[in-house]
Design a protein with these regions (language model features):
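N-terminal loops that bind phosphate or other acidic moieties
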Residues: 1-21, 25-258
């Protein structure tokens, strides 16, 4: 897991770690990661809780006395592709839970569990970062990394834009093409097409987005720099067929746009 990978990096003696947070199957606010690095989570009977998103509500005490001391000696940066907070309607559970198979009832419980965990962190560790943009990334791992690893957080797409000098390249372009597997209401929460569109908007360049599917809420993107959005699938087909023909479908759609 992530905690084990951080520990391995510490064993190698690194001074800087960049952790990319995107999709995950977890929803535990980084508690599992923290356990791997030496933290303990105890229930009302002072027994250690086997942490998962469904067990966070059992925790009554957070013990960080055994947390790996080397964490204080490294600079850890989170590169997040979303800016969701930990909890609430735009938080980890409500936005990403359904993608992981959570039912509406499960989503509500998971969100309550994350809120409980965040309250414990606030009261016992005097750290309150649940509302920071990106805290909800990867099932709340952004939150856990800030709390237990002292990580700072940056937009993943901003890091890429900076290192690739994208703004300079867009300034010389007539049109900007971007895209991802699916474009919907989540895209505006820091996904790559949104970041690209923001740069292009500042430079008054039109942005054309191509995507495997167009979901709900894309209308907001038209106010954020996106000029047009095109789906690349020509007709009704199943997912394996769409994936198999993705490259050709994208090529054909771009030819037609041109």
């Amino acid at each position: 897991g992530t905690g084990e990978m951080i520990k391995a990096a510490l064993d190698l003696g690194v001074s800087k770690i960049i952790i990319g947070l995107g999709g995950s199957i977890t929803n535990d606010a980084g508690a599992g990661m923290a356990q791997a690095l030496g933290a303990k989570f105890l229930d009302a009977h002072r027994s250690e809780v086997a942490v998962g998103g469904g067990q966070l509500d059992q925790i009554r005490m957070i013990d960080i006395s055994g947390l790996d001391a080397r964490l204080k000696q490294v600079e850890i940066t989170i590169a997040s592709d979303v800016d969701n907070p930990l909890t609430g309607i735009n938080g980890a559970s409500y936005v990403f839970g359904p993608q992981k198979g959570a039912t509406p009832e499960m989503v509500q419980q998971l969100d309550q569990n994350l809120a409980h965990f965040a309250e414990l962190v606030s009261k016992q560790l005097n750290i309150n970062v649940k509302d920071i943009a990106g805290a909800g990334a990867a099932g709340g791992l952004g939150f856990g990394l800030m709390v237990f690893a002292g990580a700072s957080i940056r937009s993943g797409v901003e890091l890429v834009i900076e290192h690739t000098q994208l703004a300079e390249k867009i300034a010389q372009a007539d049109y900007v093409f971007t895209g991802e597997g699916g474009i919907d209401f989540q895209t505006k929460f820091g996904k790559t097409p949104f970041g690209v569109a923001q740069v292009a908007k500042r430079l008054n360049k039109p942005v054309i987005a191509c995507t495997g599917y167009i979901g709900e809420g894309v209308e907001d993107l038209y106010n954020e720099g996106v000029t047009a959005i095109f789906g690349i699938v020509d007709g009704v087909c199943d997912l394996p067929t769409a994936l198999e023909n993705g490259e050709r479908n994208l090529e054909r759609r771009c030819e037609n746009i041109a």
